[in-house]
A protein has these predicted regions:
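Secretory targeting and sorting signals
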Residues: 1-22
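Ser/Thr/Asn(+Pro)-rich, low-complexity disordered segments
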Residues: 23-442, 482, 486-495, 533-536, ...
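Aromatic-rich carbohydrate-recognition surfaces in CAZymes
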Residues: 364-384, 435-473, 518-526
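Short, surface-exposed tryptophan/glycine-enriched loops
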Residues: 512-515, 853-894
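Ser/Thr/Gly/Pro-rich low-complexity, disordered linker/stalk segments of secreted
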Residues: 744-756
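Proprotein-processing/basic-patch segments
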Residues: 754-813, 817-828, 879-914
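Acidic, glycine-anchored loop motifs typical of Ca2+
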Residues: 779-780, 840-842
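Conserved aromatic beta-strand anchor motif in extracellular beta-sandwich/beta-rich domains
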Residues: 832-838
Length: 914
């Protein structure tokens, strides 16, 4: 990653060091300004007062990470709040105040906004500070990939705390006063070990850790401890009171930084997330960290039985300073390949309508709407080339080059300007707060990078650093800089590596934390990096884009679309959200309550980087069913976007809608009939994207129609190459071309159907399979926390099989035998629920909940079977066609974790089908 920054610097792509430099800074054939255009603004408060980063002397001059989960510490959006707005680290929430750091652990969702938003809003359980501390402000003192250290000082006392994503601990260093904890209500003490105190506040369990030899003193809602000449103390939120000993082990291993490292090879994206620590007492350097759902779904590292509640679903705890994930990479193509389903004459007509338009840029002036227009035109270049329309192709390329070059040259009506205080590059005319709030740079500039990547595919000289590529890379450094040592731009400005997605607000100045609406415009930038890196031979940027896209793809599936139905609260009556907030999610957009746009804003722009959405076909079907229900019928305004979305799951149905309605609709502003026609008809011919198979280069994809797979890849190289797919098939791709085919070699049935039958084994990772010969293992069933969850799944283990076909055996019923073990824990009871979705449409037609099984406190497997009896059942069974069967298992009673055996014929589900 550092090689990239060095290369950019060597090419002269370095912003001016100070305002004393030349007004226009040359970068290859282009330039940017070091001064904003007259009459424009940079970052301000909400009342328009200019602001500079609110950081300590130690941090001055360093690029500040705007667009982060904690950015309100450094970007003072409100003149009367020099501290911060609520910050959502998960599982903890925080807010800086004059006396220190408020800490909360929201565990109960509220449904607000007429049922359109769920939130786990920050609510103070306690405030960590020093006796007498009364600071006039809070500043950012240091930061790393997902941690930050706020700083308070009142002249006599100073306090620093280190907080972060996934961190159950808050680490504090203070001087000038005793450690002081004030609770929101009188605490209950459940453990008093001198310098270690266990308290319960508002039903949440915390441990307070002072230096050895100190003693915590409780007086009402105030708890203090002298530091005995030391300067450190910490606290942790506990998953249960019996976790105190484990958390005490790591209480003095203070986190000092966080780093993610990523790599791409052979169709797999790997990432390692590491915390650096220092031992304040003893020698322990390990720690505990809570993984989000999108992380623990893709790690093979051992996890503890400890869990936390969060707006992103259950977080699972890892006892280590690092963990790693591995995912199949998300497919990207510069355009869908050629197919027999596209009529050349018809496509030519549609292409000419755009290319010969009197205003192909739709009068766009600002960075966002110019970007949308660039995106529309760039999608058509490969299509024109595909059908031999070189004149149209070259005309479109000329339009793209001309408009990009206008923006990439300072001094005209449109330009980019560098702000040396905020270390950012802003395009003027700006829009949607991209200037005053530093919002949405990744949304806007992603279109520019994508368009430049399409140009580079056909004109490598244009893309050279010495020509226009230098300015493209400067936009990349502003939005997705892979370097942590670049003094001109922050590391990955918009992308939160731990949260797994980007944030849109530059200042994060909301009670609900930061937010992102259009996740698809975020992945548009990631796909653009894949294409630009591939086209220019920059494998570092290509691999960065692949990591960003693959990571955010899973986060979108889980947190925007609730693909596994394990994230949104059961009381939230929606299947998708238009916006994700730090505190939760909202069925809304910033500008409209129209359901079409709420559902479509996380789809557009539809490009060869959108194929990842096809990995969750049931979620797409649920999404569109809800859209029509909320809309009172089929889409009217954003028909094309939603037809294209449907084609990723059900191409034939999407084509039927296109055929019936293509003559009477107006394309969405970033779309064209040429692209929509080609997209829908190509997928109808080749089939929907198949995310189960990956190629060994990022620019490859697989489509499946019925039992037929079509392999596609684009080769940017100057000689032919063979692309190998994960199922063993290979495809020879000529130089600088896209190729498709049925593949050669490999297993003719690389993913064979498992043996037919109605008996399913459980597999760790959440699968049900009729295949035998699995590896024996076990999964941990989360503790019920001492509450009664009889009849209601609570942090359940979920096992599922999709695409099931079968005939219901009349009179037969579900059967199961599950091997469970509570170890030596007393009073646990495991409960099972079996659900049947007969058609795979995302709605369960039959749900059966069984009486729980009370395990004994003796280590060893016990068998839980359906003979315990049904507790409740809804719906009815019938013929299953492409259906889904789901098994959920949870602890209905008790306060402790238990285990469920997997990978054997002793833990099975038998369905009443043949």
């Amino acid at each position: 990653m550092l090689v990239l920054a060095a290369a950019l610097a060597a090419a002269g792509i370095v912003p001016a060091a100070s305002p004393a430099a030349a007004a226009n800074v040359p970068v290859g054939s282009g330039s940017y300004s070091d001064t904003r255009p007259a009459g424009t603004s940079g970052p301000t408060t909400n009342t328009g007062t200019p602001v500079t980063p609110k950081v300590t002397e130690a941090a001055k001059g360093k690029p500040v990470p705007t667009n982060d989960w904690w950015s309100s510490l450094a970007f003072q959006r409100y003149g009367d709040n020099p501290y911060s707005t609520p910050m959502y680290g998960h599982p903890l929430t925080y807010q800086a105040v004059s006396g220190g750091l408020e800490v909360g652990y929201p565990t109960s969702p509220a449904i607000v906004g007429d049922g359109r938003q769920y939130e786990y809003a920050h609510k103070r359980d306690l405030t960590l500070g020093l006796s007498g501390l009364n600071s006039a402000d809070t500043k950012a003192d240091s930061w790393s990939d997902w941690t930050v250290t706020p700083y308070w000082s009142d002249g006599s006392r100073t306090l620093r705390t280190t907080i972060g994503h996934g961190m159950p601990f808050v680490y504090a260093k203070g001087s000038g006063g005793d450690a002081r904890i004030t609770t929101a209500a009188t605490p209950t003490v459940f453990a008093d070990q001198g310098n270690v105190l266990g308290i319960t506040v508002a039903g949440h369990h915390y441990a307070l850790f002072a230096p050895s030899g100190s003693d915590w003193n409780v007086s009402g809602s105030t708890i203090t401890a002298g530091l005995g000449g030391k300067d450190y103390f910490s606290l942790a939120v506990l998953p249960s009171t019996d976790a105190l000993a484990t958390y005490r082990k790591y209480a003095y291993s203070f986190v000092t930084g966080s780093t993610t490292d990523w790599s791409y090879s052979g169709g797999i994206v790997r990432a390692t997330y590491t915390l650096t620590t220092e031992a304040k007492e003893g020698t322990e350097r390990g720690t505990l960290q809570a993984l989000y759902r999108h992380q623990w779904l893709h790690t093979s590292d051992p996890l503890t039985s400890y869990t936390y509640v969060s707006p992103r679903g259950t977080m699972k705890v890892r006892e280590s300073a690092s963990f790693s994930t591995a995912q199949k990479s998300s497919a990207v193509l510069p355009g869908l390949p050629k197919s027999s389903g596209v009529d050349t004459a018809r496509l030519r007509t549609y292409l000419n309508e755009v290319a010969n338009s009197s205003d192909p840029f739709s009068s766009a002036a600002d960075t966002y709407w110019t970007g949308k227009a660039l995106g529309k035109l760039s999608q058509l270049v490969p299509l024109a080339d595909q059908i031999g329309e070189t004149a149209v192709r070259d005309k479109l390329l000329g339009l793209l080059k001309g408009r990009l070059q206008e923006w990439f040259t300072a001094g005209g009506a449109s330009e980019f300007s560098y702000d040396s205080a905020w270390k950012t590059l802003t395009g003027y005319p700006a829009s949607y707060g991209s200037d005053t709030e530093l919002n949405d740079h990744h949304f806007h500039y992603g279109y520019y990078v994508y368009a430049a990547a399409i140009v580079a595919q056909y004109d490598q000289a244009w893309a050279a650093n010495s020509a226009w590529g230098g300015m493209v890379k400067t936009l990349v450094r502003d939005t997705a800089n892979p370097s942590r040592t670049d003094g001109s731009f922050p590391f990955l400005r918009g992308f939160d590596v731990y949260a797994g997605h980007s944030w849109a607000s530059g200042h994060q100045g909301f009670a609900a934390g930061n937010n992102q609406e259009s996740s698809s415009e975020s992945t548009n930038l990631s796909a653009a990096l894949v294409l630009w890196g591939s086209a220019t031979g920059d494998n570092s940027l290509r691999d960065l884009g692949t990591y960003l896209l693959t990571t955010e793809s899973e986060s979108i599936a889980q947190y925007w679309f609730d693909a596994d139905e394990q994230v949104f609260p059961s009381s939230f009556g929606h299947d998708t959200v238009g916006m994700v907030w730090g505190s939760g999610g909202a069925y809304s957009t910033w500008w409209t309550a129209n359901p079409e746009e709420i559902h479509g804003i996380n789809v557009l722009p539809v490009t060869g980087g959108s194929l990842h959405l096809g990995g969750e076909k049931a979620a797409i079907r649920r999404n569109l069913t809800e859209m029509e229900r909320e809309n009172g019928g089929p889409a009217q305004e954003w028909r094309d976007i939603l037809w294209e979305f449907q084609s990723l799951a059900d191409p034939a149905a999407a084509k039927s809608k296109w055929d019936a309605g293509n003559a009477s609709y107006t394309p969405e502003a970033g779309e064209s009939k040429a692209h929509t026609y080609h997209w829908i008809n190509t997928l109808d011919t080749l089939g929907a994207p198949d995310a189960t198979v990956t190629g060994d280069i990022p620019t490859s994809a697989v489509f499946t129609k019925g039992t037929t797979r079509t392999y596609a890849a684009h080769n940017y190289g100057s000689s032919a190459r063979t692309v190998t797919f994960s199922d063993g098939k290979s495809l020879t791709v000529p130089a600088r071309s896209t190729a498709t085919g049925s593949g050669t070699g490999g297993d003719p049935d690389p993913d064979p159907d498992p043996p037919t039958g109605n008996t399913f084994q459980l597999r760790s990772g959440g699968a049900l399979t009729t295949a035998t010969g699995g590896t024996a293992g076990s999964d941990t069933i989360a503790s019920g926390g001492g509450a009664n969850h009889d009849g209601t799944p609570y942090q359940p283990l979920v096992y599922e099989v999709r695409g099931v076909n079968g005939t219901y055996a009349s009179g037969a019923s579900t059967a199961f035998r599950l091997q469970v073990d509570a170890g030596t824990t007393v009073g646990l009871g495991q409960q099972a629920r079996v659900s049947y979705d007969l058609t795979g449409d995302g709605s369960f037609d039959r749900v059966e909940t069984y009486q729980y099984f009370a395990t004994d406190p003796v280590t060893g497997w016990e068998e839980y079977a359906q003979s315990r009896g049904l507790r409740s059942a809804t719906g009815s069974l019938g013929k299953m066609t492409g259906g889904t069967v789901r098994l959920e298992v949870w602890n209905a009673i008790g306060n402790g974790a238990s285990k469920l055996q997997t990978g054997t014929d002793k833990s099975v589900l038998v369905i009443p089908y043949s």
